[in-house]
Amino acid sequence: MSITRRQALGSAGAAIAASSLAKPAIAANEPIRVGYLPALTGPSSSTGIGINRGTQLAVQEINAAGGINGRQTELITRDTQSDPTKAVNGAAELSHGQNVSVVFGPVNSGESLAVVPLLARTNTPQVHPCWVDTLTDPQKYPMCFRNAPTNQQIGAAANRYVVDVLKRKKVAVISDTTGYGTASVNTYVPMLQAKGAEVVYQGNGRFTIGTYAGGPFTIR
């Protein structure tokens, strides 16, 4: 999923605003420390690198314009390597060791499923661009915010196109092995069935990111 300049600026602004809700006040001339969990390497880096470009641009423009209330923004970056375990380790270091005011990321739902509960326990504000519906919950995760559509919203648009525009009545749904892939299949299949489509094949976790070969599934 790509990110526009406007989205990046909005996300950075929202993250910084959220940081004032939970963390203690610090000196007015100190930079605002923003923890950042992009996937710069690994299978999700094709998305992570694009989001990183937008995020870096947003910070540069905010700082060049005088910062936030006169304070510069400092990104403290930890590459998740597209790995939920490394994402959790990075989040723990940022919220405890680095004492950041807010965390932006991870950029992958599978990683966020592991990170969101951890940051909620430390009352660290978080903004992420991940789609799995359960990744924002006002009761469980009151300091977690999303700057992207949910699986329900994406699924509604995609399924409408498949059933109403393409007029397909038999549909196969497959996913990768990530938490995002499993959650997506579990969300989209009932939505397709509700629109009258027959799901002839449901394949949860049939391939890993970066290794998909469509031939066997197409033949089946």
What are these regions (language model features)?
Residues 22-40:
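C-terminal segment of N-terminal export signals and the immediately downstream linker at the start
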Residues 76-84, 202-211:
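Short beta->alpha junction loops
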Residues 1-16, 20:
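N-terminal secretory signal peptides and thylakoid transit peptides that target proteins
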Residues 85, 96-203:
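Extracytoplasmic ligand/sensor domains, especially the bilobed periplasmic-binding protein
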Residues 35-54, 78-84, 107-108, 174-183:
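Extracytoplasmic "Venus flytrap"
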Residues 53-75, 196-197:
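Signal peptide-proximal N-terminal region
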Residues 84-99, 161, 213-220:
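Short, well-structured alpha-helical segments in soluble
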Residues 30-33, 71, 143:
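Envelope-exposed proteins and targeting segments
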